[in-house]
């Protein structure tokens, strides 16, 4: 029997929180496996009282800029500012397709239009129960309740297993 090396044998799933931990706002998490990265949400935070002159705060996306060629897309769970507010700023640095449900995409479109970016960003509306393929990932949008309509949980199927 021949020893066959599996190209993904040394690969591990990396879950990289870029914002949203130990704070309210800036929700953004990258999931990486091999040569593929997807980004879940892209939110902003509002400045604290001691941040004079600052209008908003966005996540540090240096890792995404450094690995730009791996970023397959942004998958968005819902339309609250802490989940979509940073998109116009981040997409200027890492322009990858955006996937979201209909209402969420409508809110995103409004933000992109305000920033004169509607034509430069690829967007796709995804229905609840529908899956999309991004690099080595398959992402299923699952209907869930939240304080805003059209919210989705995301099931991320990776070569190593499912992240829910």
Stretches with model-predicted labels:
Residues 5, 30-35, 39, 151-164:
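Metal-dependent phosphodiesterase/nuclease catalytic metal-binding core
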Residues 9, 21-25, 145-150:
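A short catalytic or substrate-binding loop motif that flags glycine-/basic-rich loops and adjacent residues
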Residues 11-14, 37:
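Extreme N-terminal starter segment of soluble prokaryotic enzymes
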């Amino acid at each position: 029997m021949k020893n066959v090396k599996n190209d993904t044998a040394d690969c591990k799933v990396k879950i990289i929180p870029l914002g949203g931990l130990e704070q309210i706002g800036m929700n953004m998490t990258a999931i990486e496996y091999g040569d593929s990265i997807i980004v879940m949400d892209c939110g902003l935070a509002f400045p604290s009282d001691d941040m004079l002159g600052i209008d908003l705060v966005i996540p540090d996306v240096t890792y995404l800029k450094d690995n730009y060629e791996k970023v397959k897309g942004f998958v968005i769970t819902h339309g609250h500012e802490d989940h979509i507010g940073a998109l116009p700023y981040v997409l200027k640095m890492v322009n990858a397709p955006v996937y979201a449900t209909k209402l969420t995409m409508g809110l995103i479109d409004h933000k992109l239009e305000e920033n004169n970016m509607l034509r430069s960003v690829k967007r796709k509306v995804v229905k609840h129960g529908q899956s999309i393929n991004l690099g080595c990932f398959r992402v299923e949008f699952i209907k869930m309740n939240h304080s805003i309509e059209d919210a989705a949980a995301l099931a991320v199927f990776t070569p190593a297993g499912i992240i829910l």
